[in-house]
C-alpha cells in the first residue's frame, strides 16, 4: 500500500476520494438505536463527507429476531416529528423478522435499526454520517441521553413504505458503491474456488464461518471473522477449505438512466428506468407501421429525446 497507494484499489475506485467501503460485524445484544443516513449530495453539503448506503447479511439470529426497515405506511414530516416527540415512532416502523442468511439492502434515506440477538455482517460506504432518530430513552456513561439528530433525519428520510429487498441477482447486493457475492465451500463436494483480481477492482473477502487457505502469490490461512484484502491486479487467486464468506468488489459506475423501447405493430412504448429498475417516466405512441422504417425510427428517436428533455436528463446520462 505504501508503494502503490490508491492503485491497489483499482481503476473503478478512482471516482472515490477515500477507501470506498467499510466491512464490519455487529453483534447486537440489545435493540440498537433507530437511525438514518443521508445520501451523498446532502452529506457532502452538510457534513463534508459522503453519505451511506449499506448492506446487512444476517450471520446469526435468535428465534424472535427482527430488524426495523422503513415505515409500515407513508408518514408526513409532521407526523414523523410528532411520533419522535411522543415516543410512538416504533408503531409506524416496519419490523422485519429475520433468520440466518437473510439480506437487507439499506439505501441512504432508509430509516432502520438492528434488533437484539442478531449478528450482522455489514458492507457499507466508507462514511461515518449517522442521524440518530430514537434511542429508547437510554443514557450514556455520563448519565445523559445520547444526542438525537431529528431535524436532519426528517430532512433526509424516505417516508414511504419500502419493498423488503430489491433483487440484485446473481449478486447478494449490487450498487455503485459495492458488489457483494456469497461464497459457500462445504469442504466436501465444493472445497475450492478460483477467481481473478483484475486491474479494475480489489477483492475483499469477509469470512463468516469456517477455515482454510487463500492463495494469491502467497498462502494465507483464514478462520471465522477474518477479513482479507487482495489488491487490484493481483491476478489469479484460490480459496480452499470449508467456509461461508462475502466477497466484495467495486464495479464501474452504472449509467444513472436507461431507455427501454418496445416497438409493436400498433403501439410503441418508451420508458425511463433508474439503476434500481424504478420506472421514472413512460409514454405510449401509435407506431403507424405502414410508414417507411426510417420515419418510424425518427419518430421513436424524437419521442425518446422529448421524454429525456421533460425529465431534465441528458443523453450522456443514459
Where would I find each of the regions flagged by the language model?
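Active-site region of the double-stranded beta-helix
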Residues: 1-100, 110, 114-211, 215-216, ...
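Glycine-rich, mobile lid/loop segments that gate access to catalytic sites or pores
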Residues: 103
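Residues on the solvent-exposed faces and adjacent turns
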Residues: 187, 232, 241
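Structural motif
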Residues: 211-213, 234-236, 267
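Low-complexity, intrinsically disordered Gly/Pro/Thr-rich segments
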Residues: 224-237
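Short glycine-rich, Thr/Ser-proximal phosphate-binding strand/loop in the N-terminal lobe
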Residues: 257-298, 302, 306-309
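Short beta-strand-loop/turn "lid" adjacent to the catalytic site in phosphate-handling enzymes
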Residues: 309-318
